[in-house]
Amino acid sequence: MKIATSFIVTGFLCAIVFAAETKVKIEDLPAQVQNTVKEQTKNAKLVGVTKEKEGGKTVYELETMANGKSRDLMIDGAGAIISVEEEVALESLPAAAQSAIQKKVAGGKITKVETVTKGSDVSYEAAYTSKSGKKAEYGVNADGTAHK
């Protein structure tokens, strides 16, 4: 009985994880979200749109590419932009943020750097592969302190 219950719980948790994000066609989006998508993809290629629940509310993630750089936006059901993650060069970050990222990665390889904007809050995120080959991300504020 315990084994059967374990399998049921595991299956349920997997279903929740995989059901959390769903691909969506533009024509199936609410009108306000469609307008934001059109506005934000004028000079970019639309890679994909997904729908998910965050804090009990439906949000949409818009993935775009422009000039070889990724730009992802989180949009609420009213079409307002919640956050933007934009690929940038490490050298474009404030010196303290660059230094903190380089110190954290030490000997590993940075694979992607993004500016993350949520309202007036701006932080920076680096994806990297450690010396041991482990993939990870590290976020910092402009002053180099770790971002939560």
Identify the residue ranges that each predicted region occupies.
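Mature soluble domains of exported/periplasmic/lumenal proteins and thiol-rich metal-chelating peptides
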Residues: A20-K148
